[in-house]
Design a protein with these regions (language model features):
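Low-complexity, glycine/serine/threonine/alanine-rich intrinsically disordered linker
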Residues: 1-184
Length: 184
């Protein structure tokens, strides 16, 4: 099996090009994924994985911007194609953040060519304004405007093998069974 290990710095996963921008904002060297109820908000297009499999996702130096009155901000980490031609998103986990930075590690199954979708996801939060299905960050300070967001330094994605690589799994399943006997 191929090894896969990638580190995505904030500057690598934020997008300000034209088109349908729904990804994180780059602000003071960190990525910020803001709350929005728009479909696929929080998608991180560069995090597509090359194969179906189990992955460990590490969100480094994560903290909450404008958390709720209890000091917490809750959200979701999901995977999917990130586009309307394949609209389903698959849960990887629930994420909790406070104003104190921490590293979060989640593990889950990802399909080939799927990306991460990461955003705050509480119903009572202010919804980030969007125009034409896209976010415009230019000239706006969403933190000062009271919007909630997840701020982080980078994301690491690595392929893992919880019960072993392909050879080890085959050994566990079939032990000493000779597959050639079936052909006879």
């Amino acid at each position: 099996d191929k090894q896969f290990h990638r580190e995505y710095l904030a500057k690598d996963i934020t997008n300000y090009g034209g088109g349908n921008n729904r990804g994180p904002q780059l602000w003071e060297g960190k990525a910020i994924s803001w709350h929005s109820q728009m479909q696929f908000a929080g998608r991180i297009t560069k995090t597509r994985v090359p194969d179906h499999g189990w992955y460990r996702i590490t969100i480094h130096d994560l903290d909450a911007i404008n958390p709720g009155s209890d000091g917490y901000l809750w959200g979701t980490l999901q995977t999917g194609s990130g586009y309307s031609n394949e609209p389903l998103l698959y849960p990887l986990g629930i994420v909790e953040a406070t104003q104190q930075s921490k590293t979060k590690i989640l593990e889950g199954w990802m399909q080939k060519d799927h990306m991460l979708v990461f955003k705050p996801n509480e119903a009572n939060l202010k919804n980030l304004p969007s125009k034409g299905g896209s976010f415009s960050f230019e000239g706006r300070n969403f933190e000062k405007m009271g919007f909630a967001g997840f701020r982080f330094e980078k994301i690491t994605i690595e392929r893992i093998y919880p019960v072993g690589d392909r050879k080890k799994v085959r050994s566990h399943l079939f032990a000493d069974f000779d597959l050639e006997e079936l052909k006879a």
